[in-house]
């Protein structure tokens, strides 16, 4: 076992802080409309230029092990916020740094870390409640475009495209982002369906860069039971292999010998195949398999209906124009089902929605309806160079996530102002002792930090002056860093999804609290390599092998 180095107390916290600051300082320069770009070196190809906080955070690895632990903890804040809300990664990083910095001062002055944590937790709870109170729902195309524009670093073209896509396929419809062949960015709507099941083995991947299995003009086998025996699957596999078309297998599960055989044949190139689990559970799974079968013109091979897998022929298989499978989702585009059958199925689901008495059932039926009728909107992103293409595509993906978050939980005023307005929620936070009260005050101070940083990135205005003026204002009044004017930010289109702001604060407080209550850091001791090369065996030349 490798020997360990252990550092305690203030030494550990100070080193962790160095790591936190290194990562946060690199990330926070990207915040706001006046945020700068960060250039990231790549081992192969051109460097990447980005203004996306989580992309910067993911690239940072520090030489010192303890400092690196601090950096990785804050990286987790950015990563988790991106996963949950799709945006707000830089805000989350700025908040985490501020909470840890303020907390550390108080721990050094003798405050109990665990009480500080309790105070921080209570404060965050009240601020989140206040954010929900000041949140407003969005529905119109214009409001959706505003959110998309802000999240795409003030690119109105992207905001308009996302609003248009949501208008075409509905708020629950599927929107994917792809690289265009030319320089123009455009929206294309393709009929299709997506369900939340990914490939059963990464060996099915055909595009290693995106870790996706892409099947062009595939056949689709739909089975409602587990497949573990290769014998029952073999006849239909041989028939599909003879057709020369790729095959997607959707079943309850594929395991053991059957999965191993599929993987081996896929790697040898004898079969173009991918396997996924069936979506849903119980009766809902049966209904969703039937939806897929109707959309693709196939048949669910089910023993309940008298169909056996070993007797299946090509007529049982569904067909589609293209299928994309990643680790989490399967998207079926251009299903070859009969339009009249698809329409009848849609009407059947609409009838079930009207009769449903359960909110949960209604929600799930509406999801199925969206998958069958909404189709897939494809945003084809064009750019002059590959570097610009990657940067723009990342911004579009962020903006899309943020816009969905806005539709789910509503919007609040942007530009760091919502957190300033939510400070009044701290009046309701109850502290049992002085240290908990200090924890609440730490959050009060940290909530100002995103606005300070947005102003600092403009490079022309004094943050303290702006902060005071915004605090004295009310409602949507704030500082527009793009125009450097004080105005009604919502009317100016400066808004943030409530979910993004909430997730940023919750994740930042969670990680900063863990760092504050850390008393020891354990790392591997690096073995120092000797500069002297080992002496070759066999003695010295010309000495007859003698030493």
Curated annotation (Swiss-Prot):
GO cellular component: cytoplasm
Keyword terms, alphabetized: ATP-binding, Chaperone, Cytoplasm, Isomerase, Nucleotide-binding
Any GO BP: protein refolding
Chief location bin: cytoplasm
Coiled-coil regions listed in the entry: none
InterPro entries linked: Chaperonin_Cpn60_CS, Cpn60/GroEL, Cpn60/GroEL/TCP-1, GroEL-like_apical_dom_sf, GROEL-like_equatorial_sf, TCP-1-like_intermed_sf
Binding site for ATP: 30-33, 51, 87-91, 415, 496
Domain of life: Bacteria
SUPFAM superfamilies with a match to the protein in the record: GroEL apical domain-like, GroEL equatorial domain-like, GroEL-intermediate domain like
Pfam annotation, one family: Cpn60_TCP1
Gene Ontology molecular-function annotations: ATP binding; ATP-dependent protein folding chaperone; isomerase activity; unfolded protein binding
Catalytic activity: ATP + H2O + a folded polypeptide = ADP + phosphate + an unfolded polypeptide
Enzyme class per UniProt: isomerase
EC number in record: 5.6.1.7
Subcellular location as annotated: Cytoplasm
Subunit structure: Forms a cylinder of 14 subunits composed of two heptameric rings stacked back-to-back. Interacts with the co-chaperonin GroES.
Record-linked PANTHER family: 60 KDA HEAT SHOCK PROTEIN, MITOCHONDRIAL
Stated role: Together with its co-chaperonin GroES, plays an essential role in assisting protein folding. The GroEL-GroES system forms a nano-cage that allows encapsulation of the non-native substrate proteins and provides a physical environment optimized to promote and accelerate protein folding.
Family according to the record: Belongs to the chaperonin (HSP60) family.
Record protein name field: Chaperonin GroEL
Taxon lineage: Bacteria, Pseudomonadati, Chlorobiota, Chlorobiia, Chlorobiales
This protein's encoding gene: groEL
């Amino acid at each position: 076992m490798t020997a360990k180095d252990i550092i305690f107390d203030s030494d550990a916290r100070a080193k962790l802080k160095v790591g936190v600051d290194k990562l946060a300082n690199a990330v926070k320069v990207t915040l706001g409309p006046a945020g700068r770009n960060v250039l990231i070196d790549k081992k192969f190809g051109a460097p990447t230029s980005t203004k996306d906080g989580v992309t910067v955070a993911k690239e940072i690895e520090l030489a010192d092990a303890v400092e690196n632990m601090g950096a990785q903890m804050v990286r987790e804040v950015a990563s988790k916020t991106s996963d949950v809300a799709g945006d707000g990664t830089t805000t989350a990083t700025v908040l985490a740094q501020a909470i840890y910095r303020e907390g550390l001062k108080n721990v050094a002055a003798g405050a109990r870390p665990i009480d500080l944590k309790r105070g921080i937790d209570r404060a965050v709870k009240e601020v989140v409640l206040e954010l929900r109170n000041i949140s407003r729902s969005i529905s119109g195309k214009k409001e959706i475009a505003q959110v998309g524009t802000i999240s795409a670093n003030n690119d109105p073209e992207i905001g308009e495209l996302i609003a248009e896509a949501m208008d075409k396929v509905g708020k629950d419809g599927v929107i994917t982002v792809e690289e265009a062949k030319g320089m123009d960015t455009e929206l294309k709507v393709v009929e299709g369906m997506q369900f939340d099941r990914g490939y059963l083995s990464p060996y099915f991947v055909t595009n290693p860069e995106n870790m996706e299995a892409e099947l062009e003009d595939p056949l689709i086998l739909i089975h409602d039971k587990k497949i573990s025996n290769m014998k029952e699957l073999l006849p239909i596999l041989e028939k599909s292999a003879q057709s020369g078309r790729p095959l997607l297998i959707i079943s309850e599960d594929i395991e053991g010998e059957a999965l191993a055989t599929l993987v081996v044949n896929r790697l040898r190139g004898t079969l173009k195949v991918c396997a996924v689990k069936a979506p849903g559970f119980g009766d809902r799974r049966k209904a969703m398999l039937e939806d897929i079968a109707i959309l693709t013109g196939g048949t669910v091979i089910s023993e309940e209906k008298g169909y056996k897998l070993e007797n299946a022929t090509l007529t049982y298989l569904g067909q589609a124009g293209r299928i994309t499978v990643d680790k989490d989702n399967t998207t079926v585009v251009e299903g070859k089902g009969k339009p009249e059958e698809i329409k009848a199925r849609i009407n059947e689901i609409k009838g079930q929605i009207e009769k449903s008495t359960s909110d949960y059932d209604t929600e799930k039926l509406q999801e199925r309806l969206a998958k069958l009728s909404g189709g897939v909107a494809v945003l084809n992103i064009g750019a002059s160079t590959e570097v610009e293409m990657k940067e723009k595509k990342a911004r579009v993906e962020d903006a899309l996530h943020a816009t969905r978050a806005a539709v789910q939980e509503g919007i609040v005023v942007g530009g760091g102002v919502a957190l300033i307005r939510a400070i009044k929620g701290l009046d309701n936070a109850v502290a049992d002792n002085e240290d908990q009260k200090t924890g609440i005050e730490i959050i009060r101070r940290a909530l100002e930090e995103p606005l300070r940083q947005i102003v600092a990135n403009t490079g022309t205005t004094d943050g303290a002056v702006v902060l005071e003026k915004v605090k004295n204002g009310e409602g949507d009044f704030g500082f527009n860093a793009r125009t450097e004017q004080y105005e009604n930010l919502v009317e100016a289109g400066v808004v943030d999804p409530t979910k993004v702001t909430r997730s940023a604060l919750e994740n930042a407080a969670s990680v900063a609290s863990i760092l504050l209550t850390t008393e020891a850091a354990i790392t591997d001791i690096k073995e120092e390599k000797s500069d002297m090369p080992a002496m070759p065996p066999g003695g010295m030349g010309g000495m007859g092998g003698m030493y």
